[in-house]
Amino acid sequence: MALRLDGKALAATVERRLTSVVDAHSKTVGQPPGLAVLRVGDDPASAVYVANKEKACARVGIASYGAHLAADTPADQVLSTIQSLNADPRVDGILLQLPLPKGLDERPLLEAIDPEKDADGLHTLNLGRLLKGEPGPRSCTPAGVMALLRSNGIDPAGQRAVVIGRSILVGQPMALMLQAANATVTVAHSRTADLAAHTREADIVVVAAGRPGMVGAEHVRPGAAVVDVGIHRKPEGGLCGDVVAEEVEPIAAALSPVPGGVGPMTVTMLLVNTVVAWCRRHGIDHELDDLIG
């Protein structure tokens, strides 16, 4: 039976560490860390995600500054809102909730966020910092995956890793983080010929393709660690990932569940980025380097 890579339990542990840092320094600084989540439109899933992030902020002592704009808000008004948040001294982290309504281009809006307040780690400057191994906010989902691996004693150094998916949100930064941890990395995608031939050679498989049930028993070698980033709602109810868990669990040495694996750590890394930005701004020694390296 595969080791369960329990993101929910790890997220609770990390939240306790963040609470300790915030409690220790908020009075001296004069204000808590602040996270602003900008939501455009009325996507129901986005509303739930934002509410969950606000609850997580409250648990660790981060102040939430939500901004909600109508779906038909023009791009220049969204940009103006971002610029206001950039200038707001209460705000240490800014998140633009994706996806955006049709007609809004996310890239220039993400680029408008102050790189030092980029809580999602998606600004070009921060992706460049990741590439160069320099400190800066890290993309939340890949950083959460790395924390899950490390906390369960899975060291990527010298290991063969396959990342399925090449999005700027997960796949590309995931590959960079694994390379920085001295893994030998292959990036696969929907057009990769004979995907199983690649994944069966891997010690670590990270699946972020956005396709339910894409990876099954035939894709995994015995003893591999498999991280399932996908999350999908099944027609009959309930959730599933990109991995057929019941097939892979008897084969793999470790497997992240859906839900309860990567998802909780994605939210927690958003909090980590915000607290670290607050600490850097105020010259605080945060002792969170193991989560952002």
Curated annotation (Swiss-Prot):
Sites where the protein binds NADP(+): G165, R166, S167, S190, I231
Function as written in the Swiss-Prot or TrEMBL entry: Catalyzes the oxidation of 5,10-methylenetetrahydrofolate to 5,10-methenyltetrahydrofolate and then the hydrolysis of 5,10-methenyltetrahydrofolate to 10-formyltetrahydrofolate.
Cited SUPFAM superfamilies: Aminoacid dehydrogenase-like, N-terminal domain (SSF53223), NAD(P)-binding Rossmann-fold domains (SSF51735)
Pathway given in the UniProt record: One-carbon metabolism; tetrahydrofolate interconversion
PANTHER family, per the entry: C-1-TETRAHYDROFOLATE SYNTHASE, CYTOPLASMIC, C-1-TETRAHYDROFOLATE SYNTHASE, CYTOPLASMIC-RELATED
One cellular component term from this protein's GO annotations in UniProt: cytosol
Protein name, entry field: Bifunctional protein FolD
Similarity comment: family membership: Belongs to the tetrahydrofolate dehydrogenase/cyclohydrolase family.
GO MF, any single term: methenyltetrahydrofolate cyclohydrolase activity
BP term (GO), one: L-histidine biosynthetic process
PROSITE patterns: THF_DHG_CYH_2
Reactions accelerated catalytically: (6R)-5,10-methylene-5,6,7,8-tetrahydrofolate + NADP(+) = (6R)-5,10-methenyltetrahydrofolate + NADPH; (6R)-5,10-methenyltetrahydrofolate + H2O = (6R)-10-formyltetrahydrofolate + H(+)
NCBIfam families to which the protein is assigned, alphabetical: PRK14186.1
Entries under HAMAP family matching the protein: THF_DHG_CYH (MF_01576)
Coiled-coil segments on the chain, per record: none
Subunit organization: Homodimer.
Keyword Amino-acid biosynthesis: yes
Keywords: Amino-acid biosynthesis, Histidine biosynthesis, Hydrolase, Methionine biosynthesis, Multifunctional enzyme, NADP, One-carbon metabolism, Oxidoreductase, Purine biosynthesis
Taxonomic superkingdom: Bacteria
Gene3D superfamilies named in the record: Leucine Dehydrogenase, chain A, domain 1, NAD(P)-binding Rossmann-like Domain
Signal peptide range in chain numbering: none
Enzyme Commission designation: 1.5.1.5, 3.5.4.9
Database matches in CDD domains: NAD_bind_m-THF_DH_Cyclohyd
